[in-house]
Amino acid sequence: MSAKAEKKPASKAPAEKKPAAKKTAPSSDGKKRTKARKETYSSYIYKVLKQTHPDTGISQKSMSILNSFVNDIFERIASEASKLAAYNKKSTISAREIQTAVRLILPGELAKHAVSEGTRAVTKYSSSTQA
């Protein structure tokens, strides 16, 4: 038997990689290290807020809650899409797996709107890369 045939799929997903926290105190050579960047969806949430309610602001606490919500939903969709790909013996998550995962996770009308917006975004991206 070859080594490739003996490989078994991992029983659980690999651990999420987190950037190492950098020090702000000066090091031995006198240079100050910068803090590790934390990636959030704050700027995107703010842009959507301004499109829908231009005269409304948002507190830091509310922004933090929405950021956690977006991360949670993305994690659920990715996890479900991963399971769907595994069930179908595929190693790649495609738009079809994402769409099915969204239909399974989001309830009723929300799923319909999410699927239509996702399809529209993929179509827009596809047409922009071909041109």
UniProtKB/Swiss-Prot annotation:
CDD domains: HFD_H2B. The modification Phosphoserine is found at residue 11. GO terms for cellular component: nucleosome; nucleus. Monoubiquitinated by the UBC2-BRE1 complex to form H2BK123ub1. H2BK123ub1 gives a specific tag for epigenetic transcriptional activation and is also prerequisite for H3K4me and H3K79me formation. H2BK123ub1 also modulates the formation of double-strand breaks during meiosis and is a prerequisite for DNA-damage checkpoint activation. Phosphorylated by STE20 to form H2BS10ph during progression through meiotic prophase. May be correlated with chromosome condensation. There is a cross-link at residue 124 (Glycyl lysine isopeptide (Lys-Gly) (interchain with G-Cter in ubiquitin)). This is Histone H2B.2. The lineage of its organism: Eukaryota, Fungi, Dikarya, Ascomycota, Saccharomycotina. The keyword Ubl conjugation applies. The gene is HTB2. PANTHER family: HISTONE H2B (PTHR23428). GO terms for molecular function: DNA binding; protein heterodimerization activity; structural constituent of chromatin. Residues 1-38 are annotated as: Disordered. There is a cross-link at residues 7-8, 17-18 (Glycyl lysine isopeptide (Lys-Gly) (interchain with G-Cter in SUMO)). Residues 1-19 have a biased composition (Basic and acidic residues). Core component of nucleosome. Nucleosomes wrap and compact DNA into chromatin, limiting DNA accessibility to the cellular machineries which require DNA as a template. Histones thereby play a central role in transcription regulation, DNA repair, DNA replication and chromosomal stability. DNA accessibility is regulated via a complex set of post-translational modifications of histones, also called histone code, and nucleosome remodeling. SMART domains: H2B. The modification N6-acetyllysine is found at residues 7-8, 12, 17. It comes from Candida glabrata (strain ATCC 2001 / BCRC 20586 / JCM 3761 / NBRC 0622 / NRRL Y-65 / CBS 138). The nucleosome is a histone octamer containing two molecules each of H2A, H2B, H3 and H4 assembled in one H3-H4 heterotetramer and two H2A-H2B heterodimers. The octamer wraps approximately 147 bp of DNA. It is found in: Nucleus; Chromosome. Keywords: Acetylation, Chromosome, DNA-binding, Isopeptide bond, Nucleosome core, Nucleus, Phosphoprotein, Ubl conjugation. Belongs to the histone H2B family.
